[in-house]
A protein has these predicted regions:
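Carbohydrate-active catalytic/glycan-binding domains of CAZyme proteins
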Residues: 1-503
Length: 503
């Protein structure tokens, strides 16, 4: 057994989303799981909303689920008309002569949302609306919102928002603050370089006691960062940059997030990177892949869209009609170096006449834990994404996954095992999130630092399907707390999603 530094696990949940915790394994592989489409939680059909709503931020405030989103309406057919008139596509057809709103909807269960009655702005003669932020002078492209969990954060800055603005020479990332998530005031421009024409996000990391900021920039195929004046929207590659700060004032820029030297250099749009709400050990995000399929244009004869002939409009509309999107899943242990799936986590789905279009698969920033749809079943994770972008009033749609269920350590019917690296834990019990078939099982053996099973710590064969099954041992686990141990999972027709030591 090779020497390995002992990991301090404590009572933090270890999610089985990578091979970081594994020393040896045989017959077990990392399996990604895809979300299940559930229901439309909000249709953006108010006069100040429309087909280009999106850029959704999720926050839980007390027992209320909050959903902030950009409200705008710029149908793809409008862009076609402007192209014919020799004008470029823009947001001038949006709500009230170019005015875009940041709106708020709320929910008690995370399954259906209603518009909050904010009544701050008169929009199209209607004061009873859910807009929390507008700008009378400059178009709002993006406005991400998060709740700051830094214990030293002033109360008037607990809600933070980031917004892209254009300057005469360069783009800027503006920071707005709010005590309640309703009234936002401009605070300052963040001293970060970038293009920012996407959904830029930030978070407070309790583990390292610093802020992480994820933004957009562009680079050339040879890796050079593209100067703003040279950006080529067709050929330059959109990327994700990361910066860190202890105080949200002074920032250290780390450059592009690292996917490893063998990773394909592909354009990535929104990133949505955040910490997982059930484990402080892991970051996750759902960046959107951008793929211009003009070379395969014969497909657009079948991928029809309402209001115009998409195939015939390819030359006029360019990438607006020929680009398609999907979302991939990325995870990280440090917020700087990421694993990324090659297979899509989410794609456009069955052709319905309003998808397979530039703007599909843009997911909300964050996720909620929600009750299951069937009585007696465990809570699940709800994700949200828009459907019908630029073709109809956007439908914000809920998707679900098992708690901790982005990935699992997966064993086939023929079986396999995992032996973890040595670690120390706190607590007197072990709980696992797992699923087996009627013929399957997982058997957990607590081993010493060298990998030999410790007598009295063999669970026997455990079967079933639970997000929180307490594992029984003959001896008391508390006797091993704080001592270096390993776990050996012997598995057959089984998925292991996570495990945690607790009291």
């Amino acid at each position: 057994m090779k020497e390995t530094n002992c990991i301090r696990l404590g009572s933090t949940r270890e999610v089985c989303w990578d091979m970081h915790f594994i020393e040896n394994c045989e017959g077990v592989r990392l399996q990604m799981h895809k979300p299940v489409r559930k229901n439309t939680v909000l249709t953006c059909d108010k006069p100040w909303e429309g087909s280009t709503c999106g850029y959704i931020s999720l926050l839980k405030v007390g027992d209320v689920f909050r959903m902030y989103y950009r409200a705008a309406n710029a149908m793809l057919i409008d862009s076609l008309e402007k192209k014919v008139e020799k004008e470029g596509p823009d947001f001038t057809g949006c709500s009230e002569a170019g005015k875009i709103s940041i709106c708020l909807a709320e929910s008690k269960d995370g399954k259906t949302f209603t518009r909050a009655k904010i009544c701050k702005f008169d929009i199209l003669g209607e004061k009873e609306n859910n807009a929390v932020f507008r700008d009378e002078e400059e178009v709002i492209d993006n406005f991400s919102i998060f709740y700051d969990e830094n214990p030293d954060c002033p109360s008037e800055e607990k809600f933070k928002a980031l917004r892209y603005t254009e300057g005469p020479e360069e783009n800027h990332l503006a920071y707005y603050k709010s005590p309640d998530g309703i009234d936002f005031t401009f605070e300052r421009i963040l001293p970060i370089a970038g293009k920012f024409d996407t959904f830029n996000v930030t978070l407070w990391d309790k583990k390292t006691e610093q802020y992480f900021l994820y933004t957009r920039d562009y680079h050339k195929p040879d890796g050079r960062t593209t100067p703003r004046c040279e950006v080529d929207l067709v050929h330059d590659i959109r990327d994700i940059r990361v910066s860190t700060s202890k105080d949200f004032k002074t920032w250290e820029e780390h450059g592009q997030i690292d996917f490893g030297q063998d990773a394909e250099d592909i354009p990535l749009y929104t990133n949505g990177i955040t910490k997982y709400f059930r484990s402080e050990n892991i970051f996750w995000g759902l960046p959107v892949r951008y793929n211009d399929r003009l070379a395969d244009k014969h497909n657009f004869k079948d991928l029809t869209l309402p209001g115009f002939d998409r195939y015939a409009s390819l030359e006029k509309l360019g990438r607006e009609a020929s680009v398609v999107n999907d979302a991939v899943l990325i995870t990280s242990r440090d917020g700087l170096h990421f694993d990324r799936t090659d297979e899509a986590f989410a794609a456009s789905g069955p052709e319905d006449g309003s998808n397979w279009i530039y703007g599909d698969c843009y997911h909300a920033y964050g996720a909620f834990e929600t009750e299951a749809d069937f009585p007696g079943e465990a809570n699940e994770m709800s994700l949200y994404a828009g459907r019908g972008y630029r073709t109809r009033p956007l439908e914000i749609t809920r998707y679900t996954l098992r708690l901790d269920g982005f990935f699992s350590w997966s064993a086939p019917y023929s079986g396999g095992y995992v032996l973890t690296k040595p670690f120390t834990f706190d607590g007197d019990s072990l709980s696992i999130n797992f699923a087996t078939s009627a013929m399957g099982h997982v058997q957990i053996l607590v081993c010493d630092e060298t990998g030999n099973p410790i007598p009295g710590y063999d669970s026997g064969k455990v079967f079933g399907n639970s997000v929180d099954r307490t594992v029984e041992f003959e001896n008391d686990l508390a006797q091993l707390a704080g001592k270096p141990v390993r776990l050996r999972f012997e598995m057959k027709d089984c998925e292991l999603y996570s495990f945690v030591f607790e009291n």
